[in-house]
Amino acid sequence: MKIIIGILLVFFVTFSVGTAFGHGAGIEASPLIFTNDREVKVTVELLPADFYKSDQKMIKIDAYDHTNRETITNASFKVQIFNDNQLLLDEWFYTQDGNLILEVDPDVIVTNRNTIEISGEKNSFGLWEKTDTTPLIVTGPIFDEGGIYTFKIILDAQDEV
């Protein structure tokens, strides 16, 4: 029998980016959050290890169910990114396999120098979703300078147990 479990979690992750604050890369995870008889952890990782100096920046976000020892699939993530308390990004994303990968290119200006934009496709629910042919790319002035970056992640998952 299939049971659909809905999970809604919120957590904050803070990264320091820039030479004044260290290497500017890393991985941060929420504490274990207990919901629906499950222990869930959400992780945000900045890739590669030399994220701030790299021309190929990526953000990887996933949710892991420690109870079942599996990545949570069919996950929607509301991703908010702040730099020194200024909101830079506030969007919903969907990933079927549970691993959200955002490519980041702060040097590309699509329509406005001061605007952060997303290239990719939206699904029928209006959520950004990577496809086989279209990656999700965040462009504009994000991670283009040092400072304290805070991620606020809301997880809304409909996985099968």
Predicted regions and their residues:
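Secretory targeting signatures
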Residues: 1-24, 61
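N-terminal soluble domains immediately following signal/targeting peptides that reside
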Residues: 21-161
